[in-house]
Amino acid sequence: MPFMDKQGVTQMPDLLRWRILACLAPALSFAALQADDAGGWTHYGGSQRGMQYSALDQISRENVATLEEHWRFRTGEMGQNANHPFAFQANPILVENRLYISTGTAIVIALDPSSGREIWRYDPQIDRAINYAEVANRGVSSWIDAAAERGAPCRHRIFVGTLDARLIALDGTNGKPCADFGDNGEIHLDRGVRTERGEWVVYTITSPPVIVNGVLVTGSAIGDNQK
């Protein structure tokens, strides 16, 4: 926040100024170094910058009106036994010729992008009887171990966060949890976090994590005005 001196002139403390610059520098460097994945959609929002843009030009303003539906897929997730309405908000990603989506309850599904055929499905089995502050999941993240041989278990990993604050790693090939990640494929992020477990669960994960230089970074969602 700005500060004012005795003359009423707005000042910014040196410490705060340097903190802002320190935050901006890596952000600018990251944006300068990262290029959109030409022809792909390997991250939430299309690229590591989340620009929601593709350089492909096969579909344009001139021909978009002539497109026809090729296939349609239904997740089957209708919020059965849930105490709170939820919405489908996922942004699919396309990696190694597979389409990955997630439902509002963090069920992860891998599809054949050519036919819409379901290849595998993973259900984290969240407790649907609980009132979550927000019932949504906006997608998954993908990471490929460049040092692993092609075909090795969990060479390609799909990460998803859950409403009960778990971070789960799945084998992109078959959807099985990666046993070497956390506790048999999952980490409970709410352990050690002081939250009041009352009528509502206020600490959840609704957005996909970000992976930068081999480091997995995840945020969280909290429920407002629930107390």
Regions found by a protein language model. Name each.
Residues 66, 96-98, 105, 114-115, ...:
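Residue-level recognition of short loop/turn positions
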